[in-house]
Amino acid sequence: MNDFGIKNMDQVAPVASSYRGTLKRQAAFDTFDGSLLAVFPSLNEEQTLQEVPTGLDSISHDSANCELPLLTPCSKAVMSQALKATFSGFKKEQRRLGIPKNPWLWTEQQVCQWLLWATNEFSLVDVNLQRFGMTGQVLCNLGKERFLELAPDFVGDILWEHLEQMIKENQEKNEDQYEENSHLNSVPHWINSNSLGFGVEQAPYGMQTQSYPKGGLLDGLCPASSAPSTLGPEQDFQMFPKARLNTVSVNYCSVGQDFPAGSLNLLSSASGKPRDHDSAETGGDSFESSESLLQSWNSQSSLLDVQRVPSFESFEDDCSQSLGLSKPTMSFKDYIQDRSDPVEQGKPVIPAAVLAGFTGSGPIQLWQFLLELLSDKSCQSFISWTGDGWEFKLADPDEVARRWGKRKNKPKMNYEKLSRGLRYYYDKNIIHKTSGKRYVYRFVCDLQNLLGFTPEELHAILGVQPDTED
């Protein structure tokens, strides 16, 4: 045995003579020891050999009573495909109930509807819906660990995977649209003081803005065009707050059909501090406050106005509100009837919060709030329909402004600020001022298709009598 080892060492690794004897003996010993190990394999090697072909020894003794075997990569892929096929069934439910595709936009009611669907689809038991009494934005911000704590045992991973899948699909859609649309060029030095108090510095001649990506109804009404619209110097920019920002750069990220609140990236930098009276209290909502109605129920000419620069309300509420671009497949009237908690007697026929959830517009917007007041009999002393179609009158504009400020948590709201929000709707063809009549306005968008009521039907419900006052 030693001779065999010595010969091999002489051939492979000749060394200095002073160390030759020691190395030869060590090599021979290693060879002998290796031969013994080859004859008597260790217990660990036996276990390793068993684990490779069967995989059974990887299961601990504590899991001997498990009903299901461990998932292999192959079985996981099959399971994932099966879950995706099951999840696709929720899309029909979304269309039926008017639930936005983007979970970030869900109301508490829509979160509950999703869980009810999952309960029926997966035959779940002991599901505590009260634990999920939250909006979609709060739900998506929970994180997986916190979500699993609230979810029923053994199915939390499935529900979380479904939620992640819907969010991912929405993000991918936004990214695809983003690649097809360039950013709006940054425009410095927009805002400057003037006699009106909140005008802007005249925009440069030929300033261009890129159109937003269109989705749903927009694709049919407004064919995509690579030519950008051009803003001339004569256009009205009298809608920015004075001294709100000295220098503003506006950067628009692409807006998909649905996207989480906050993803509209309006970045502004100020070189000076705003004054106290120039706080974020404005009469209207943010730039997207009218777009959900425009992009689903308005005319082509009005839809083209979406390409314009944002109004002064764009900087309100930290620019966190999102566009509602999806068109529900049913009217608001049908939506209310399908709800498990119909509108109570004595309450507004058109609650603003429910209407906001129906249109997927996010926070309550001014036009939605006005419809709530107009559909509430208890508010007819200060705002009411005139009886002439969708025309309405502010009998007490200060009270309307006060209530709007209370709803938006803006105690300094007044009619002057409210009227600025109303004027923003003029060129969007949502609300127009009735000429020759003080405090009289008219909805000029297609409210009938949106609400499912004709003006006469709504007037009859509310007991409205035609206004004979000139």
From Swiss-Prot:
PNT domain location: 85-170
Bilayer-crossing residues are none
From the Swiss-Prot or TrEMBL record, state where the protein is found. Nucleus
Question: Which GO BP terms apply?
Answer: cell differentiation; regulation of transcription by RNA polymerase II
* Swiss-Prot/TrEMBL keywords: DNA-binding, Nucleus, Phosphoprotein, Proto-oncogene, Transcription, Transcription regulation
* Recorded family membership: Belongs to the ETS family.
Q: What is this protein called?
A: Protein C-ets-2
Where does this protein come from, organism-wise? Bos taurus (Bovine)
